[in-house]
């Protein structure tokens, strides 16, 4: 506790930087070894989906790591510190998301054999809708990745003096390098290693913190006495930052927009060998998410007990709540060289996993949605080179954009969920319209996307300009009375630097800011977890209404496989290229078996239209299922099998 009382600024030592450097080297080595095995990537399909040969375990852990970035490593403990253990309800929202993704969205994407999620929007609506989805995704991912890269570097710099540009460049360059060289397989297997590092960092902090404060019983007693064990918060007020309802309603839809239809996640589970493996990957992902979130939340409770009546934010030792966790690590491990470096590796493992995922996914949608439709005759090797080049470009762009995230207020966790909610929420609505409402048409979905984006962006900007008060968000009280008293007893005088300038336990001011608009304490004050739900609901309602007014689409005009309602119960298996020869006799055949009006010259493979035609023929013939397809339009490799 000496460091707590003296107020000295702790720093990382040589051993800590050594552990951090080791994590970077191991990540690079894994990425290069896995990515270059078996001669590297022979096609863009290999680069973006690993040849669709990946097993459930690594894919599941990669899914859990992709959005468990340094933002969560630093943000979740600080939120649990300030709002209590009710943050564990986030795990329920994630569970509902995993179930809905496995039952509703994953089967459609998997059986269509898509590489780009937004290809579905063109198949269901039009190319204009596909381009809107692609551009929205790239913007959202660039902003989110900027937060993930910049925010932890800034926080650690403010707390420990860690050089901000050294940390940015080291993680950014290494991540971009192994992603560009190794592709999807490199990203997945480095994610597996980084999940292990993240969990190890949390568990070491938990064990040491619990030991220092007197054991688990002491932690539970003090947390209960200070209202931190508050799982039974069912307040329906949408302005309360965290309640059961914000996590179950708002949280579920935010996570659904990130897992159900987000390119980064869809790209992973469609890379699994079979649909059953993809569902198993989502289950493993849920276990990983639960372990990470629960460990982070428990760290926040232990951190509160450690700093009981000695809040470092009130004492001025830190300047923002996101800095609690790195300060705690340095305080409790000050006499154990190298251990704080494990937490540093933990935080940046999250950064590497998220950034590599984002870079690979942005390159994938650029190739599939913007390049291939224009340059259909490109050879596979050229597409691989272009894909690697795009990975380098997007990695450099993410480093450049990272500084913009410093403009976001409210904490790194809120900033990341705000970006994903505002932009991905309306996109989720577009996919819901496509898969579940046959009557929805192109004008309807475009109008819905515009309305959903406008409304969610409006409330997010309003909340940024006029943030709600701590009383409105229901921040729990904390105090620095014990440390102030210790300072008085030691010197006989009260050091002005130790005066709690913003003691959260004091009564709120009764004055009202006349410059705040009327919406500031109502509409703008709703929990940031509802931004995505607001965008999704607006998109669905507006899209359905406009579709009815402009002439609904007839269900008979839609190709089979585009609606969830038409899915058969059987699951799909997407075979690797070398196994195509041993598939059963029900494969969709080559161009020589096409009907007369659809025959192609020798050497040409079925196009997207042929694929949908044969899917319809399968259903008419009573096959009871329809056929998945792997590849892309016009001359791409086809790999198809019964479901």
Swiss-Prot record:
Chain positions recorded as Na(+) 2 binding sites: 72, 144, 258, 416-417
Impact after mutating residue 226 to A/D/E/K: Significant loss of iodide transport activity but no effect on its localization to the cell membrane
Extracellular side: 1-14, 81-84, 158-163, 209-243, 302-335, 409-411, 466-525
Transmembrane segments: 15-31, 57-80, 85-105, 131-157, 164-181, 190-208, 244-266, 279-301, 336-363, 387-408, 412-437, 442-465, 526-550
Tissue: Expression is primarily in thyroid tissue, but also to a lower extent in mammary gland and ovary. Expression is reduced in tumors.
Notes on activation and inhibition: Dysidenin and perchlorate inhibit iodide transport activity. Oxyanions inhibit iodide transport activity by blocking the binding sites for iodide and one of the sodium ions.
Residues bearing attached sugar chains per UniProt: 489, 502
Result after altering residue 242 to A: Loss of localization to the cell membrane, significant loss of iodide transport activity but no effect on homodimerization. Reduced homodimerization. Loss of iodide transport activity
Name used for this protein in its record: Sodium/iodide cotransporter
Organism of this sequence: Homo sapiens
């Amino acid at each position: 506790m000496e460091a707590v009382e003296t107020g000295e600024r702790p720093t990382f030592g040589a051993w800590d930087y050594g552990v951090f450097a080791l994590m970077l080297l191991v990540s690079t080595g894994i990425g290069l070894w896995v990515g270059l095995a078996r001669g590297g990537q022979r096609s863009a399909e290999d680069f973006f989906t690993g040849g669709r040969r990946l097993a459930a375990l690594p894919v599941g852990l990669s899914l859990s790591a992709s959005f468990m970035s340094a933002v969560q490593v630093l943000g979740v403990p600080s939120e649990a510190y300030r709002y209590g253990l009710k943050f564990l309800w986030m795990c329920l929202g994630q569970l509902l998301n995993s179930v809905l993704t496995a039952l509703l969205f994953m089967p459609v994407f998997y059986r269509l054999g898509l590489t780009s999620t937004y290809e579905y929007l063109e198949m269901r609506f039009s190319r204009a809708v596909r381009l809107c989805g692609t551009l929205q995704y790239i913007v959202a991912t660039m902003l989110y990745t900027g937060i993930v890269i910049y925010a932890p570097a800034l926080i650690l710099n403010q707390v420990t003096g860690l050089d901000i540009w050294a940390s940015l460049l080291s993680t950014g360059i290494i991540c971009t390098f192994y992603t560009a060289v190794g592709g999807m397989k490199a990203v997945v297997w480095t994610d597996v290693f980084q999940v292990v590092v993240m969990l190890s960092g949390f568990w070491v902090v938990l064990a040491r913190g619990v030991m220092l404060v007197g054991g688990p019983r002491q932690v539970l007693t003090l947390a209960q006495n200070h209202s931190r064990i508050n799982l039974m918060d069912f307040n329906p007020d949408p302005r309360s930052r965290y309640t059961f309802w914000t996590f179950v309603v708002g949280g579920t839809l935010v996570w659904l927009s990130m897992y159900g239809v987000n390119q980064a996640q869809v790209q992973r589970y469609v890379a699994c060998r079979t649909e059953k493996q993809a569902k198993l990957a989502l289950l493993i992902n849920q276990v990983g998410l639960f372990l990470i979130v629960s460990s982070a939340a428990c760290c926040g409770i232990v951190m509160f007990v450690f700093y009981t009546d000695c809040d470092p934010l009130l004492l001025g030792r830190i300047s923002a709540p996101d800095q609690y966790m790195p300060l705690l690590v340095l305080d409790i491990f000050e006499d154990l060289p190298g251990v704080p470096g494990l937490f540093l590796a933990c935080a940046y493992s999250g950064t590497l996993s998220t950034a590599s995922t984002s870079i690979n996914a942005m390159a994938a949608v650029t190739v599939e949605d913007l390049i291939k439709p224009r340059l259909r005759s490109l050879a596979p090797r050229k597409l691989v080179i272009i894909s690697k080049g795009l990975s380098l470009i997007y990695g450099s762009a993410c480093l450049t954009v990272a500084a913009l995230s410093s403009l976001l207020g409210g904490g790194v966790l809120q900033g990341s969920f705000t970006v994903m909610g505002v932009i991905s929420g309306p996109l989720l609505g577009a996919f819901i319209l496509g898969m579940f409402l046959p009557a929805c048409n192109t004008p309807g979905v475009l109008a819905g996307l515009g309305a959903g984006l406008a409304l969610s962006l409006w409330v997010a900007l309003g909340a940024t300009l006029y943030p709600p008060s701590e009383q409105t968000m229901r921040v729990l009280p904390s105090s620095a009375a014990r440390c102030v008293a210790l300072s008085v007893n030691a010197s006989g005088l009260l050091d002005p630097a130790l005066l709690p300038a913003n003691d959260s336990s004091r009564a709120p001011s009764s004055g009202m800011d006349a410059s705040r608009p009327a919406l500031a304490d109502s509409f703008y004050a709703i929990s940031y977890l509802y931004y995505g739900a607001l965008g999704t609901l607006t998109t669905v309602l507006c899209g359905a209404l406009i579709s009815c007014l402009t002439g609904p689409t007839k269900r008979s005009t839609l190709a089979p496989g585009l609606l969830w309602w038409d899915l058969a119960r059987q699951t799909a298996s997407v075979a690797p290229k070398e196994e195509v020869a041993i598939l059963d006799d029900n494969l969709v055949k080559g161009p020589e078996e096409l009907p007369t009006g659809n025959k192609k010259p020798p050497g040409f493979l079925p196009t997207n239209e042929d694929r949908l035609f044969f899917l319809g023929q399968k259903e008419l013939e009573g096959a009871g299922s329809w056929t998945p397809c792997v590849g892309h339009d016009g001359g791409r490799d086809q790999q198809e099998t019964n479901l």
